[in-house]
C-alpha cells in the first residue's frame, strides 16, 4: 500500500510547510461529499494520531487514516499549473467514476 508524490507536489508541500514554520507532513483523506459520493481532503498535520498510517515519499511525510487508505491506495499526488490556475491533482487508480464538475468521485 502506498501513496506517492510527483516532484512538483513534494516541492510545493515542502514550501508550504517551510512558510508555515511547523508541521509533520501532509494529511490525505476522503469524506462523503458531492454528487458522486466522495471528495479528497488535504491538510497539513502537526502530529499523526496512533491510528494513522505514515508514508514518506521524496522527503514528505504523508499521513492517512486507516479508513481512507482503502480508497487512496496507489494514488499519486501532483501539483499542476494550467493557465492561471494551479493546484494539487490526484491520480487515483481506484476511481470508477467522477462527477461532471470534478469535485467528487466514486470507487
Curated annotation (Swiss-Prot):
Induction conditions: Repressed by IscR.
Comment on bound cofactor: Binds 2 iron ions per dimer. The dimer may bind additional iron ions.
Coiled coil: none
Cofactor section: Fe cation
Family annotation (InterPro entries): Fe-S_cluster_asmbl/transfer, FeS_biogenesis, FeS_cluster_insertion, FeS_cluster_insertion_CS, HesB-like_dom_sf, IscA_proteobacteria
Pfam families for this protein: Fe-S_biosyn
Record GO cellular component, one term: cytoplasm
An MF annotation (GO) of this entry: ferrous iron binding
Consequence of substituting residue 101 to S: Loss of iron binding activity
Record-listed Fe cation binding positions: 35, 99, 101
Keywords from the named record: Iron, Metal-binding
GO biological process, any: iron-sulfur cluster assembly
Other comments on record: 2 iron atoms may bind between dimers.
Function: Is able to transfer iron-sulfur clusters to apo-ferredoxin. Multiple cycles of [2Fe2S] cluster formation and transfer are observed, suggesting that IscA acts catalytically. Recruits intracellular free iron so as to provide iron for the assembly of transient iron-sulfur cluster in IscU in the presence of IscS, L-cysteine and the thioredoxin reductase system TrxA/TrxB.
Record-stated family: Belongs to the HesB/IscA family.
Subunit structure: Homodimer; may form tetramers and higher multimers.
Name listed for the protein in its UniProt record: Iron-binding protein IscA
Organism of this sequence: Escherichia coli (strain K12)
Amino acid at each position: 500500500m502506498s501513496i506517492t508524490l510527483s516532484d512538483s507536489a513534494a516541492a510545493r508541500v515542502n514550501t508550504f510547510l517551510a512558510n508555515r514554520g511547523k508541521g509533520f507532513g501532509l494529511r490525505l483523506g476522503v469524506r462523503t461529499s458531492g454528487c458522486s459520493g466522495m471528495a479528497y481532503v488535504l491538510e497539513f498535520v502537526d502530529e499523526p494520531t496512533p491510528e494513522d498510517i505514515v508514508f514518506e515519499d521524496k522527503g514528505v511525510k504523508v499521513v492517512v487514516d486507516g479508513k481512507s487508505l482503502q480508497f487512496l491506495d496507489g494514488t499519486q499526488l501532483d501539483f499542476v499549473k494550467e493557465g492561471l490556475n494551479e493546484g494539487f491533482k490526484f491520480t487515483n487508480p481506484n476511481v470508477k467514476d467522477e462527477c461532471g464538475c470534478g469535485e467528487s468521485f466514486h470507487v
